[in-house]
Amino acid sequence: MSEPRQILVTSALPYANGSIHLGHMLEYIQTDMWVRFQKLRGNQCIYVCADDAHGSAIMLRAEKEGITPEQLIANVQAEHSSDFADFLVDFDNFHSTHSEENRELSSLIYSRLREAGHIATRSVTQYFDPEKGMFLADRFIKGTCPKCAAEDQYGDNCEKCGATYAPTELKNPKSAISGATPVLRDSQHFFFKLPDFQAMLQQWTRSGTLQDAVANKLAEWLDSGLQEWDISRDAPYFGFEIPGEPGKYFYVWLDAPIGYMASFKNLCARRPELDFDAFWNEGSKAELYHFIGKDIVNFHALFWPAMLEGAGFRKPTAVNVHGYLTVNGAKMSKSRGTFIKARTYLDHLQPEYLRYYYAAKLGRGVDDLDLNLEDFVQKVNSDLVGKVVNIASRCAGFIHKGNEGVMVGGDAAPELTEAFLAAAPSIAEAYEARDFGRAMREIMALADRANAWIADKAPWSLAKQEGKQDEVQAICAQGINLFRQLVIFLKPVLPVLAADAEAFLNVAPLTWNDHLTRLENHTLNPFKALMSRIEPAKVEAMVAASKEDLLAAEAKAPAGNGELAKDPLSAEIEFDTFAAVDLRVALIVKAEAVAGADKLLQLTLDIGDERRNVFSGIKSAYPDPSKLEGRLTMMVANLKPRKMRFGVSEGMVMAAGPGGEEIYLLSPDSGAKPGQRIK
């Protein structure tokens, strides 16, 4: 017998900024099935994952909710962990990229790349939000498409005409965060010299590590010549600061795949039999597999292996890529109720229904998978309840009633037993190749043969005939043995059904090699229903609940075109949070334009016993700043001073409006005095 394989498996890291939906679950379910198959075969197979917990989106959402990014990612991780567990996804470790292990490994890999000459630095020009004091990623810039003039389009592509462009080509650009008009600024950035690994990647991507369709797509990138990859972002940013570079942070996609290593390292600290170096060092004999969606192939099949190569670590054995999920033949839709969250599904249906349906439709390619809800009901009810479970329910009663639950010995259908044994290698081969659909078809073909044989023997008719009891017991014992074989073959897909079947069969947890044996003169436990049919009404209720999720979200934003519709209310905060903000009346002593800044005014504010210097992006509404002098306004007086290019800003004045010329500086009623607290 060959030695057990050492295998490390990962799924792509879910982003810690939202809920898991059924599209996400396609990946985690297929990975889990493959891992369970390997463990069933006796291999050492470790499955790790983590939340992808860095980036501007997380920083900004936390700010909007009035919590820290650390609190946000902790809340999301708890939600994700619960959803995965209830879908029977059995990680050996589910960690976070915001961890000390990931910080250390990211710094190590960066340092090795830099020392080997694979890091370049140069100045880049980007849009900068003067109000938020941050550089803007493409998705945080909106404006008018330069091609078709559609408004409210993102900084890199138009959703209306499909055009792609540079953010600087966008007309009337606005910050999607503050509404301010962004300005162009230069910043020093760090780049990974991906072209250094062109030859290695051309060979590696054609070495059997990828499906042919994926390798062919990557060849387009490789043939056109690889470009250096920007791996840095400027503060403010939620992530890891680059060693020795204050105010510069690793781009989220730099440390995200390193999160695979970090999660495994975290697991190694709890399981001393695992050796991190044995899995990750160059020359490792362990196998490493990444399961990912086709939207992130470039990161995993170009950037990631190049980073590993340059830093002296091993590369993946294979990157297994899958397609997207559609529902009822179309993209998931919130309005149609087909954008279904994992928790919404679990509130209505059993997880194994979906696990089986995904398995039945998954091939080894990158084609999209369609969840047809009508077919879903029919297939699960027909295959699992009508075929597999039906065998046990047909036979168990006769054994308990006629022989006190004891299965007789002997083989009532040697040709059928041989057919089941002969099918095992092909089913195993399909599982290994991730061709789950083929495996399910072969298993259901066996179930059809078993049911046809039982129907032909008709033990229910024989039981009514004198002297036929031995034949009834032989038929039903054979039926239970065939059922047991099917359970073994389906165990990677249906772990709960398998556990319940093991309890009924009165056996220890089944392994793959148990299909080579039979139960004879063996006592069964009383049979209990192993799976119920899907009720179409429950599927309809799930879709309705998904629509309600959308309506609930819309209810928080008022209908119509009022100001709240344009700028919805932020999340509720506690009174203590509000009380921490010190609002004061301020007298504008001096107001003047700032040289070199299109939108800023420099205000000198009197707050009673002291004066403050404040920079404010209100110039577009107040082109003659001298008219503001002598006016009372309101300011946030305890805001931490912020160093800007033009000086230090010691607070923030309060204004309303969407921006541009529509900015309205707030003023207290007459009689208020500078320095008075606003309550």
UniProtKB/Swiss-Prot annotation:
* Reaction it catalyzes: tRNA(Met) + L-methionine + ATP = L-methionyl-tRNA(Met) + AMP + diphosphate
Q: Where is this motif: 'KMSKS' region?
A: 331-335
Which InterPro entries does the UniProt record give?
Answer: aa-tRNA-synth_I_CS, Anticodon_Met, Met-tRNA-synth_bsu_C, Met-tRNA_ligase_1, Met-tRNA_synth, Methionyl/Leucyl_tRNA_Synth, MetRS_core, MetRS_Zn
The free-text cofactor remark is: Binds 1 zinc ion per subunit.
Chain ranges for the short sequence motif 'HIGH' region as given in the UniProt record? 14-24
Q: Where does ATP bind?
A: K334
Q: What is its main location?
A: cytoplasm
Which of the seven top EC classes does this enzyme belong to?
A: ligase
| Sequence positions that bind Zn(2+) | C145, C148, C158, C161
UniProt GO molecular function:
ATP binding; metal ion binding; methionine-tRNA ligase activity; tRNA binding
Q: Can you supply a Gene Ontology BP term from the record?
A: methionyl-tRNA aminoacylation
Give the tRNA-binding domain ranges.
Answer: 577-679
Under Gene3D superfamilies, the record lists: HUPs (3.40.50.620), Isoleucyl-tRNA Synthetase, Domain 1 (1.10.730.10), Methionyl-tRNA synthetase, Zn-domain (2.20.28.20), Nucleic acid-binding proteins (2.40.50.140)
| GO CC annotation, single | cytosol
Give the domain of life: Bacteria
Q: What is its EC number?
A: 6.1.1.10
UniProt entry keywords in alphabetical sequence: Aminoacyl-tRNA synthetase, ATP-binding, Cytoplasm, Ligase, Metal-binding, Nucleotide-binding, Protein biosynthesis, RNA-binding, tRNA-binding, Zinc
Q: Where in the cell is it found?
A: Cytoplasm
General function of this protein: Is required not only for elongation of protein synthesis but also for the initiation of all mRNA translation through initiator tRNA(fMet) aminoacylation.
What family does the database annotate?
Answer: Belongs to the class-I aminoacyl-tRNA synthetase family. MetG type 1 subfamily.
Subunit text: Homodimer.
> What PANTHER family does this protein's entry cite?
METHIONINE--TRNA LIGASE, METHIONINE--TRNA LIGASE, CYTOPLASMIC
Q: What HAMAP family does its record include?
A: Met_tRNA_synth_type1
Q: Quote the protein name from its UniProt record.
A: Methionine--tRNA ligase
Q: Which organism is it from?
A: Pseudomonas putida (strain ATCC 700007 / DSM 6899 / JCM 31910 / BCRC 17059 / LMG 24140 / F1)
**The organism's taxonomic lineage, starting at the top:** Bacteria, Pseudomonadati, Pseudomonadota, Gammaproteobacteria, Pseudomonadales
